[in-house]
Amino acid sequence: MEASAGLVAGSHNRNELVVIRRDGEPGPKPVKHTNGQVCQICGDDVGLTPDGEPFVACNECAFPVCRDCYEYERREGTQNCPQCKTRFKRLKGCARVPGDEEEEDVDDLENEFNWRDKTDSQYVAESMLHGHMSYGRGGDLDGVPQHFQPIPNVPLLTNGEMADDIPPEQHALVPSFMGGGGKRIHPLPYADPNLPVQPRSMDPSKDLAAYGYGSVAWKERMESWKQKQERLHQMRNDGGGKDWDGDGDDADLPLMDEARQPLSRKIPISSSLVNPYRMIIIIRLVVLGFFFHYRVMHPVPDAFALWLISVICEIWFAMSWILDQFPKWFPIERETYLDRLTLRFDKEGQQSQLAPVDFFVSTVDPMKEPPLVTANTVLSILAVDYPVDKVSCYVSDDGAAMLTFEALSETSEFAKKWVPFCKRYSLEPRAPEWYFQQKIDYLKDKVAPNFVRERRAMKREYEEFKVRINALVAKAQKVPEEGWTMQDGTPWPGNNVRDHPGMIQVFLGQSGGHDVEGNELPRLVYVSREKRPGYNHHKKAGAMNALVRVSAVLTNAPYMLNLDCDHYINNSKAIKEAMCFMMDPLVGKKVCYVQFPQRFDGIDRHDRYANRNVVFFDINMKGLDGIQGPIYVGTGCVFRRQALYGYDAPKSKKPPSRTCNCWPKWCICCCCFGNRTNKKKTAKPKTEKKKRLFFKRAENQSPAYALGEIDEGAPGAENEKAGIVNQQKLEKKFGQSSVFVASTLLENGGTLKSASPASLLKEAIHVISCGYEDKTDWGKEIGWIYGSVTEDILTGFKMHCHGWRSIYCIPKRAAFKGSAPLNLSDRLHQVLRWALGSIEIFFSNHCPLWYGYGGGLKCLERFSYINSIVYPWTSIPLLAYCTLPAICLLTGKFITPELTNIASLWFMSLFICIFATGILEMRWSGVGIDDWWRNEQFWVIGGVSSHLFAVFQGLLKVIAGIDTSFTVTSKGGDDEEFSELYTFKWTTLLIPPTTLLLLNFIGVVAGVSNAINNGYESWGPLFGKLFFAFWVIVHLYPFLKGLVGRQNRTPTIVIVWSILLASIFSLLWVRIDPFLAKNDGPLLEECGLDCN
């Protein structure tokens, strides 16, 4: 894909395709090709014969094999060609081996009869080298079908790659997941367990030292072997066993030496920390049982309505607590080994074998998501510490704004200077705005004069870049009447946001766009999908699915990372951290995504509105990681492309050591005999087998697409017919694009080499057309799932239902950082959007309460998903419960009868358990008490405001069909630090918590006044009511502080609402008249006394 192709705009349905070039763009550069042959056994060049001709080992099929491997195969191997199985004939210059045909030529006697000094050092070295090598090349050959690849005669454990700096005696399998990358395979020696071990033949006349036994080298090797076994044993013990869901091991991949050690490690929470936590949860459950038994069996006759409401609310809170608490039963942490990843896949001086990654950045409105913020995110991606040819950045502009397009063009030019500067000095973070804002002494570790000089120059360059971006923003404030035009006078295709063609522009790429030092830059692609009236575009989920298809056509990396436009890469090695899980041979096969926690910049020190969400990211997510993995939170997540395509997770193979070891031998024989009988009955002739691709439907009635086994021996006509049927099925699922459908079958990624750039561009425009997803499974079973504004929950839920597991990765340095809303109104609107999405899922077909049973979803993982969609409903009992204290104080009644000693014991035990649970959670997770308390406060604030409105809006949408649109949270900020913190924006979300505050304040005043008026005996019952009211007020305190703001900026609307509500409750207070003394004596009418 060429970077200089220009902006490509078009519509597949209208058969339009236009290429708009920018002024001064050079033409496309020719692409260089190499035509050298590589040995398919060892990976070296095939080489030439002494006559200068290419060396050909097999005259039948000309399979590429070098001379050394040819001689070794004839001398020590099968003597057959790995491809056509024809016996190798002796070539001129090669030694004769048993079985060769008789030859009359005598021009090569020396080599024919192998007259060579066996003690020659070169000969010995070659023999030792060949003794540790075997044949097989992992990658598919260019132009050769997969089923024609060489098949070794001994079973191989796996495919792999050799680490060249490891001594030959330590060579081991190094798995690789790269397709077409030239993988070398070094299999373990295969030994049939049914045969006796063959002793090594030795000449009695020779000293044992000649064989290595008893020598110093032999002793050193033995000591080295023992140390390795000890390290492996220790590593296994440190691993902490298996995951709760049984993942983590693969019987086909035994651990061997350092080159085969895992790339990551699971670290369970210490039992001294987590066991008391589990015990207090069980105790709290028991106490809750006794507590509810007392509450239900002891109603309050004179306040039955208040008692009934309170009991219902408390039961709901208990159920909500169970759903939230038990998914945290198995908390774990993880550790990665980047040095092992580098040793295995990214060795210095060699071509990197790390898997390619496609980066997705989504933006909608450049006025609410400033282009400078998006530019910093893109720059941090382009400068990431990852091989350049493995990185591709796709920016989705769902608003089709020319401002975003021009800002991205400026960003690509500035990247040519910024990227080499970051990599030369290993800067962190690599987003220039945040790097230059760091309040650190940058001269502390960088004392080189060149760095100081270049840093100052780069800062000037960045300030000029900001001026250009801000000038574009200022220019975009006033839209011309005729619409925007490009530099060459062409009208901007996206002038009509709701009706425009699809647009693609490659700014940087392999064939164009090098930095100032002449080095290649990662690919940068601008994408704006087609939009037409009458089509449902599914908001962000639809945009992400369009990026999935475009990237599959152009680059098709096996892994994808999605980021919001305001989340930049704070740790340049974050992608390698994710690859430690994805490319790990032990745990990587079943991992669908690696989720990183969200961290934020620009939040005030006290985190008044719980923007950091520390409790969720550092407690809940760690607990889920011990079950089936964390839920997807919408950004900062590395996906496996195949998992997004709706494929089922690979099934785990049960190790042989775990089967039938505890059964008698006669039982094993019976089982084995029964299996053989069944196999004989179900066996089919080879002629009936055919290569096929089938789809299977899971028990949960959700289609899952899994590749079936590929068998050989099918006749050509039947095979072709089956292929046509399978192609039709795939197009029905994935859409009418043959290029994209073909890419979905490449598990390790890669693009079609036969396709031209022009055809790829045309296909890319096709897959982002507005009608491409019609009558397909996009948004239903494939990609980001539609049906909710919180598409992230549904997407992760579907993958977990297919049996995949996810991983939670918390690097020491935060992987990504973003911006969070600082003022109260924006924060409440953000929470409203999340809660509304949960309500939409609750009423959808994908509700975790009834969807996905019989699939791969774990029970406790389901608890977590159920909690994520029912939590907004807690707002109704929470609002009622927060109103009860004021009603009790105003009416003089209470929700419980007079407490006995036993009742007091249950109440005190419950309070102690609640506090103990929180303390022990903070203890094992490392969360501070400030963060924990802020989370508790905002749970009440959000519950009585945003969550409550989300419930009513969701009901309106389901019952009346009234759809509520959400607004994008503003990412811009004032120049003054924390200036947005005190900005007040009126919204109806503020009415319920404001009313609760005033109501409880009036109730407290009324209760105290009533107690003063009635004497000392009324103070006892008052304490319980006052504690209840102050519990509500303390939880709403951050809301009160945000509502009032600065003393000189108290908004008028707050004063008006306060006076209005205070007047209403004052009238109610006068009606109650608490200062009037109450006569508790007998009624005169009843006693019969006439006081007149």
Swiss-Prot record:
Catalytic activity of the protein: [(1->4)-beta-D-glucosyl](n) + UDP-alpha-D-glucose = [(1->4)-beta-D-glucosyl](n+1) + UDP + H(+)
InterPro entries (UniProt xref): Cellulose_synth, CES_Znf_RING, Nucleotide-diphossugar_trans, Znf_RING, Znf_RING/FYVE/PHD
EC id: 2.4.1.12
Active site per UniProt: 398, 792
Membrane topology qualifier: Multi-pass membrane protein
Membrane spanning stretches: 280-300, 303-323, 869-889, 902-922, 939-959, 988-1008, 1020-1040, 1050-1070
Statement: the UniProt record of this protein carries the keyword Glycosyltransferase: yes
Cofactors (names): Mn(2+); Zn(2+)
GO (cellular component) term, any one: plasma membrane
Positions with a binding annotation for Mn(2+): 540, 564
Chain ranges on the Extracellular side, renumbered to this chain: 301-302, 890-901, 960-987, 1041-1049
SUPFAM superfamilies registered for this protein in UniProt: Nucleotide-diphospho-sugar transferases, RING/U-box
MF terms in GO: cellulose synthase (UDP-forming) activity; cellulose synthase activity; zinc ion binding
Residue intervals of every RING-type zinc finger in the record: 39-85
Full protein name: Probable cellulose synthase A catalytic subunit 5 [UDP-forming]
Gene name of the encoded protein: CESA5
